[in-house]
Amino acid sequence: MIEELQDYLAKEFNIHFDNPALLAEAFTQASYVNEHPNQGLKYYERIEFLGDAVLELIVSEYIYKRFPELPQGKLTRLRAAMVCEDSFSKFAKECHFDQYIRLGHGEEMAGARERPGLLCDIFESFIGALYLDQGRPAVEKFVQRVIFPKLDMGWFDHAVDAKTSLQEFLQRDGDIAIEYHLVEESGTENDPEFKVNVTANGDVIGEGKGSSKKHAEMQAAQQALDNMRNKNK
Protein backbone atom coordinates (compact mmCIF):
# COMPACT_ATOMS: atom_id res chain seq x y z
CA MET A 1 0.00 0.00 0.00
CA ILE A 2 2.82 2.44 0.82
CA GLU A 3 4.45 1.72 -2.54
CA GLU A 4 1.15 2.55 -4.23
CA LEU A 5 0.97 5.76 -2.20
CA GLN A 6 4.47 6.72 -3.33
CA ASP A 7 3.47 6.18 -6.96
CA TYR A 8 0.29 8.21 -6.48
CA LEU A 9 2.10 11.14 -4.86
CA ALA A 10 4.72 11.16 -7.60
CA LYS A 11 2.11 11.14 -10.36
CA GLU A 12 -0.44 13.51 -8.83
CA PHE A 13 1.75 15.98 -6.92
CA ASN A 14 5.29 15.33 -8.20
CA ILE A 15 6.30 14.46 -4.62
CA HIS A 16 9.10 11.92 -4.19
CA PHE A 17 9.96 10.91 -0.63
CA ASP A 18 13.64 10.36 0.11
CA ASN A 19 12.69 8.48 3.29
CA PRO A 20 9.63 6.30 2.62
CA ALA A 21 9.61 5.22 6.27
CA LEU A 22 8.31 8.67 7.20
CA LEU A 23 5.47 8.28 4.74
CA ALA A 24 4.64 4.83 6.10
CA GLU A 25 4.57 6.18 9.64
CA ALA A 26 2.28 9.05 8.63
CA PHE A 27 -0.32 6.70 7.14
CA THR A 28 -0.28 4.03 9.86
CA GLN A 29 -2.85 3.98 12.66
CA ALA A 30 -2.09 2.49 16.07
CA SER A 31 -4.53 -0.36 15.46
CA TYR A 32 -2.39 -1.59 12.56
CA VAL A 33 0.76 -1.49 14.68
CA ASN A 34 -0.99 -3.45 17.43
CA GLU A 35 -1.93 -6.18 14.97
CA HIS A 36 1.68 -6.41 13.68
CA PRO A 37 3.66 -6.26 16.94
CA ASN A 38 6.87 -7.84 15.64
CA GLN A 39 7.46 -5.55 12.66
CA GLY A 40 8.87 -2.56 14.53
CA LEU A 41 6.26 -0.24 13.03
CA LYS A 42 5.48 3.31 14.10
CA TYR A 43 2.13 5.06 13.91
CA TYR A 44 1.27 8.65 13.07
CA GLU A 45 0.65 10.29 16.46
CA ARG A 46 4.01 12.05 16.92
CA ILE A 47 4.38 13.10 13.32
CA GLU A 48 0.81 14.43 13.31
CA PHE A 49 1.77 16.69 16.23
CA LEU A 50 4.47 18.26 14.07
CA GLY A 51 2.26 18.55 10.99
CA ASP A 52 -0.41 20.40 12.94
CA ALA A 53 2.11 23.04 14.01
CA VAL A 54 3.60 23.38 10.52
CA LEU A 55 0.18 23.87 8.94
CA GLU A 56 -0.86 26.49 11.46
CA LEU A 57 2.33 28.47 10.87
CA ILE A 58 2.17 28.35 7.07
CA VAL A 59 -1.53 29.21 6.93
CA SER A 60 -1.06 32.02 9.46
CA GLU A 61 1.77 33.58 7.47
CA TYR A 62 -0.13 33.25 4.20
CA ILE A 63 -3.31 34.97 5.34
CA TYR A 64 -1.31 37.61 7.24
CA LYS A 65 0.45 38.61 4.01
CA ARG A 66 -2.52 38.16 1.70
CA PHE A 67 -4.99 40.18 3.77
CA PRO A 68 -3.05 43.16 5.19
CA GLU A 69 -6.29 44.98 5.95
CA LEU A 70 -7.77 42.30 8.22
CA PRO A 71 -7.53 42.91 11.98
CA GLN A 72 -6.26 40.23 14.32
CA GLY A 73 -9.74 39.01 15.28
CA LYS A 74 -10.78 38.31 11.70
CA LEU A 75 -7.44 36.70 10.90
CA THR A 76 -8.00 34.40 13.87
CA ARG A 77 -11.47 33.43 12.66
CA LEU A 78 -10.25 32.79 9.13
CA ARG A 79 -7.35 30.65 10.30
CA ALA A 80 -9.66 28.67 12.58
CA ALA A 81 -11.90 27.90 9.60
CA MET A 82 -8.94 26.73 7.51
CA VAL A 83 -7.03 24.86 10.22
CA CYS A 84 -9.67 22.55 11.68
CA GLU A 85 -10.92 18.98 11.59
CA ASP A 86 -13.71 19.67 9.13
CA SER A 87 -11.40 21.31 6.57
CA PHE A 88 -8.50 18.90 6.95
CA SER A 89 -10.74 15.85 6.65
CA LYS A 90 -12.17 17.24 3.40
CA PHE A 91 -8.68 17.97 2.07
CA ALA A 92 -7.59 14.43 2.91
CA LYS A 93 -10.61 12.97 1.12
CA GLU A 94 -10.06 15.21 -1.88
CA CYS A 95 -6.44 14.01 -2.06
CA HIS A 96 -7.64 10.37 -1.79
CA PHE A 97 -5.51 9.86 1.32
CA ASP A 98 -8.29 7.71 2.80
CA GLN A 99 -7.40 4.95 0.34
CA TYR A 100 -3.87 4.55 1.69
CA ILE A 101 -4.35 4.45 5.49
CA ARG A 102 -3.05 1.29 7.16
CA LEU A 103 -5.71 0.17 9.65
CA GLY A 104 -6.21 -2.81 11.91
CA HIS A 105 -8.96 -5.23 10.92
CA GLY A 106 -11.34 -4.08 13.64
CA GLU A 107 -10.99 -0.43 12.72
CA GLU A 108 -11.42 -1.25 9.05
CA MET A 109 -14.66 -3.10 9.77
CA ALA A 110 -15.85 -0.21 11.96
CA GLY A 111 -15.58 2.21 9.05
CA ALA A 112 -12.65 4.18 10.46
CA ARG A 113 -11.43 5.00 6.96
CA GLU A 114 -14.33 7.45 6.58
CA ARG A 115 -14.02 8.96 10.06
CA PRO A 116 -13.40 12.75 9.87
CA GLY A 117 -11.17 12.74 12.94
CA LEU A 118 -8.89 10.10 11.44
CA LEU A 119 -8.80 11.80 8.04
CA CYS A 120 -7.82 15.05 9.74
CA ASP A 121 -5.03 13.27 11.62
CA ILE A 122 -3.72 11.67 8.44
CA PHE A 123 -3.65 14.99 6.60
CA GLU A 124 -1.66 16.56 9.44
CA SER A 125 0.70 13.61 9.69
CA PHE A 126 1.35 13.67 5.94
CA ILE A 127 2.32 17.33 6.24
CA GLY A 128 4.62 16.45 9.14
CA ALA A 129 6.28 13.72 7.09
CA LEU A 130 6.67 15.97 4.07
CA TYR A 131 8.21 18.68 6.23
CA LEU A 132 10.73 16.28 7.78
CA ASP A 133 11.62 14.73 4.43
CA GLN A 134 11.82 17.80 2.19
CA GLY A 135 11.44 20.91 4.30
CA ARG A 136 9.09 23.84 4.39
CA PRO A 137 9.23 24.77 0.66
CA ALA A 138 7.74 21.40 -0.29
CA VAL A 139 4.93 21.83 2.23
CA GLU A 140 4.20 25.34 0.96
CA LYS A 141 4.02 24.09 -2.61
CA PHE A 142 1.56 21.38 -1.58
CA VAL A 143 -0.75 23.65 0.43
CA GLN A 144 -0.66 26.27 -2.32
CA ARG A 145 -2.28 23.68 -4.52
CA VAL A 146 -4.58 21.95 -2.04
CA ILE A 147 -5.61 24.56 0.56
CA PHE A 148 -5.12 28.13 -0.57
CA PRO A 149 -7.26 27.94 -3.76
CA LYS A 150 -10.23 27.16 -1.50
CA LEU A 151 -10.13 30.77 -0.30
CA ASP A 152 -11.03 31.97 -3.80
CA MET A 153 -13.62 29.22 -4.14
CA GLY A 154 -15.53 30.59 -1.14
CA TRP A 155 -14.96 27.62 1.17
CA PHE A 156 -14.36 29.83 4.18
CA ASP A 157 -16.61 32.81 3.44
CA HIS A 158 -19.21 31.86 6.02
CA ALA A 159 -17.06 29.79 8.35
CA VAL A 160 -16.64 31.26 11.80
CA ASP A 161 -14.56 30.42 14.86
CA ALA A 162 -17.47 29.96 17.24
CA LYS A 163 -15.29 30.38 20.34
CA THR A 164 -14.03 33.76 19.15
CA SER A 165 -17.53 34.86 18.11
CA LEU A 166 -18.94 33.81 21.48
CA GLN A 167 -16.29 35.77 23.32
CA GLU A 168 -16.97 38.88 21.23
CA PHE A 169 -20.75 38.46 21.65
CA LEU A 170 -20.63 38.13 25.43
CA GLN A 171 -17.95 40.67 26.20
CA ARG A 172 -19.28 43.53 24.11
CA ASP A 173 -21.14 44.84 27.17
CA GLY A 174 -18.41 44.16 29.71
CA ASP A 175 -15.98 41.56 30.99
CA ILE A 176 -17.58 38.12 31.32
CA ALA A 177 -15.68 35.02 32.43
CA ILE A 178 -16.03 32.32 29.76
CA GLU A 179 -14.78 28.84 30.61
CA TYR A 180 -14.87 25.43 28.93
CA HIS A 181 -15.19 22.28 31.05
CA LEU A 182 -14.67 18.65 30.05
CA VAL A 183 -17.80 16.88 31.30
CA GLU A 184 -17.33 13.39 29.93
CA GLU A 185 -14.81 11.36 27.94
CA SER A 186 -16.01 8.14 26.31
CA GLY A 187 -15.42 5.92 23.30
CA THR A 188 -12.17 4.12 22.52
CA GLU A 189 -8.58 5.19 22.01
CA ASN A 190 -9.08 5.16 18.25
CA ASP A 191 -12.59 6.64 18.32
CA PRO A 192 -12.85 8.93 21.35
CA GLU A 193 -15.77 11.22 22.14
CA PHE A 194 -15.53 14.26 24.38
CA LYS A 195 -18.42 16.15 25.95
CA VAL A 196 -17.77 19.76 26.95
CA ASN A 197 -19.88 22.56 28.37
CA VAL A 198 -19.21 26.27 28.24
CA THR A 199 -20.07 28.63 31.08
CA ALA A 200 -20.46 32.39 31.33
CA ASN A 201 -19.85 33.69 34.84
CA GLY A 202 -20.43 30.15 36.09
CA ASP A 203 -23.72 29.50 34.25
CA VAL A 204 -23.82 26.74 31.62
CA ILE A 205 -24.83 28.26 28.28
CA GLY A 206 -23.95 25.50 25.82
CA GLU A 207 -22.83 21.90 25.39
CA GLY A 208 -20.99 20.12 22.63
CA LYS A 209 -19.56 16.75 21.60
CA GLY A 210 -16.65 15.93 19.33
CA SER A 211 -13.80 13.57 18.54
CA SER A 212 -11.40 15.98 20.24
CA LYS A 213 -11.74 18.44 23.10
CA LYS A 214 -11.10 21.29 20.69
CA HIS A 215 -13.92 20.20 18.40
CA ALA A 216 -16.28 19.67 21.34
CA GLU A 217 -15.51 23.17 22.60
CA MET A 218 -16.33 24.60 19.17
CA GLN A 219 -19.66 22.77 19.17
CA ALA A 220 -20.46 24.02 22.67
CA ALA A 221 -19.66 27.59 21.68
CA GLN A 222 -21.81 27.31 18.56
CA GLN A 223 -24.77 26.01 20.59
CA ALA A 224 -24.37 28.88 23.04
CA LEU A 225 -24.32 31.39 20.19
CA ASP A 226 -27.42 29.84 18.59
CA ASN A 227 -29.29 29.90 21.91
CA MET A 228 -28.49 33.54 22.59
CA ARG A 229 -29.28 34.69 19.08
CA ASN A 230 -32.63 32.89 19.17
CA LYS A 231 -33.46 34.67 22.44
CA ASN A 232 -32.70 38.02 20.84
CA LYS A 233 -35.01 37.46 17.87
From Swiss-Prot:
GO molecular function, one term: double-stranded RNA binding
InterPro entries from the UniProt entry: dsRBD_dom, RNase_III, RNase_III_dom, RNase_III_sf
Cofactor(s) needed for function: Mg(2+)
UniProt feature coiled coil, ranges: none
Domain RNase III span(s) in chain numbering: 6-135
DRBM domain: residues covered: 161-230
Database matches in CDD domains: DSRM_RNAse_III_family (cd10845), RIBOc (cd00593)
Transmembrane segments: none
Record's keyword terms, sorted: Cytoplasm, Endonuclease, Hydrolase, Magnesium, Metal-binding, mRNA processing, Nuclease, RNA-binding, rRNA processing, rRNA-binding, tRNA processing
Region (Disordered): 205-233
GO CC term, one of those recorded: cytoplasm
EC number: 3.1.26.3
Binding positions (Mg(2+)): 48, 121, 124
Compartments (UniProt record): Cytoplasm
One GO BP annotation of this record: rRNA processing
Active site: 52, 124
UniProt catalytic activity: Endonucleolytic cleavage to 5'-phosphomonoester
Quaternary context: Homodimer.
Protein function: Digests double-stranded RNA. Involved in the processing of primary rRNA transcript to yield the immediate precursors to the large and small rRNAs (23S and 16S). Processes some mRNAs, and tRNAs when they are encoded in the rRNA operon. Processes pre-crRNA and tracrRNA of type II CRISPR loci if present in the organism.
Family from the record: Belongs to the ribonuclease III family.
NCBIfam families per record: RNaseIII (TIGR02191)
Identification of the protein by name: Ribonuclease 3
Lineage: Bacteria, Bacillati, Bacillota, Bacilli, Lactobacillales
